[in-house]
Amino acid sequence: MLILISPAKTLDYQSPLATTRYTQPELLDHSQQLIHQVRQLSAPQIARLMGISDKLADLNATRFHDWQPHFTPDNARQAILAFKGDVYTGLQAETFSDADFDFAQQHLRMLSGLYGLLRPLDLMQPYRLEMGIRLENPRGKDLYQFWGDIITDKLNETLASQGDRVVINLASEEYFKSVKPKKLNAELIKPVFLDEKNGKFKVISFYAKKARGLMSRFIIENRLTKPEQLTAFNSEGYFFDEETSTQDELVFKRYEQ
């Protein structure tokens, strides 16, 4: 099974590292082309494009300017330890054992606007470039057109090398749109997390994001390799709801706390 998750806007380049092992991203040639593109933007243009404050725009203009393709532990950090959003709060990779990192490196992939597809131990330099932004580039009007089939092809290559045919989609809609399901040589399974609010079960963004991380951790810690094993997921009060689930959409619910 190959797990797909989204990246995070919040980054951490300060905390102690849980591992010193690292690999290099596999799509850096494409990242370099995007960097060349965004370096042509002024900080005010970045602010408008990304809908962020002037301060954040200045920071990211500096990041784009400082970015260089020779990644070392001195100027970069492993992706799984650099991202720090709600998904990564659930994942808690900073507590992984060496064996957990091994399994994650094989079975977990992070989608990224700048890097395309990252393995957990791939080094990355700090950036902000969300997949959904409309960044004009030589390949089209946005990042979906820029990446085209590249991410899907890389996923197919990974699946083939592992003799695998199952992808667990724990990514957001914005990021999963960079994958072409019809061209993916795999069965796609999407876990959905519903929380009870005022007697009704619905997707609550913060909880759902964290649950995607919890599910990723559950798969990694328990070395799960078959989709039917996912139904045992019970972290932080979630339970599998067979009645509302389908073969390709597994529904997990949690009662109001």
Curated annotation (Swiss-Prot):
Coiled coil start-end: none
Pfam family, one: H2O2_YaaD
Recorded superkingdom: Bacteria
Annotated InterPro entries: YaaA (IPR005583)
One Gene Ontology cellular component annotation held by this UniProt entry: cytosol
Biological processes per GO annotation: response to hydroperoxide
Family (UniProt): Belongs to the UPF0246 family.
UniProt name for this protein: UPF0246 protein YaaA
Classification of source organism: Bacteria, Pseudomonadati, Pseudomonadota, Gammaproteobacteria, Enterobacterales
Gene: yaaA
